[in-house]
Swiss-Prot record:
SUPFAM superfamilies: Prokaryotic lipoproteins and lipoprotein localization factors. A lipid is attached at residue 19 (S-diacylglycerol cysteine). Belongs to the LolB family. Disulfide bonds: none annotated. Residues 1-18 form the signal peptide. It is found in: Cell outer membrane. This is Outer-membrane lipoprotein LolB.
Length: 203
């Protein structure tokens, strides 16, 4: 597998983990209050490390995710700081730039991922999932501290699970807000570990 093919597979795996429908469930008042606070976040930046484990590939990368209503951007870099892949999504369209200077564009991110992987999938909910919101999930579970503990979803023939393994507190609007800082995305043959080392809520 070439590096470019691996990065496309990695990107599609991350995107796969961002799209899924939430059933009606009984939740606590504390969770509902936490969920409402998360839903007010429109602009954020997340920095961290990503580990990918597949059937024939293992890779460690740094990531930087920047999201606002006008721009969403994911940049993956090697441990030496070289940009491996950058995905940019705006209201006008989506673009992927690869380490070998190839640029691929489409009217929206769904079309771009389809062109790269042959899979049609929505990507609109990925920022919410990173924050710990169960937007459009098949099912979800809460932790004893009323944060999101796990999500389950089926996309095509694959059953995906997102486990929120650790949270960290940040100060936001003079209150303490727990945000995910360790997640595992997994299906039958792929595991993606995310460690978020820094959150920046910018509004």
């Amino acid at each position: 597998m070439t590096l470019r093919s691996f990065l496309i597979l990695l990107l599609s795996s991350i995107v796969l983990a961002g799209c899924s429908s939430v059933p009606e469930s009984v939740t606590s008042v504390e969770w509902q209050a936490h969920e409402q606070r998360l839903e007010t976040i429109d602009n954020f930046q997340a920095t961290g490390k990503l580990g990918y484990i597949g059937p024939d590939q293992r890779q460690s990368l740094n990531f930087f995710w920047k999201h606002s209503s006008a721009l969403s951007q994911l940049r993956l870099t090697t441990l030496l700081g070289q940009t491996a892949l950058k995905l940019t999504i705006t209201p006008q369209g989506a673009t992927v730039e690869t380490y070998d200077d190839q640029v691929l564009s489409a009217r929206d991110a769904n079309q771009l991922i389809y062109r790269l992987t042959g899979l049609m999938m929505p990507v609109d909910h990925l920022p919410d999932w990173l924050l710990g919101l169960p937007t459009d999930a098949d099912s979800f579970q809460l932790s004893p501290t009323n944060t999101l503990q796990a999500l389950d979803k089926q996309i095509g023939l694959n059953d995906w699970n997102i486990a929120y393994q650790r949270y960290g507190d940040i100060e936001w609007h003079e209150q303490t807000l727990p945000l995910p800082n360790k997640l595992r995305l997994s299906t039958s043959d792929v595991k993606i570990n995310l460690v978020i080392t820094k959150w920046n809520i910018t509004q």
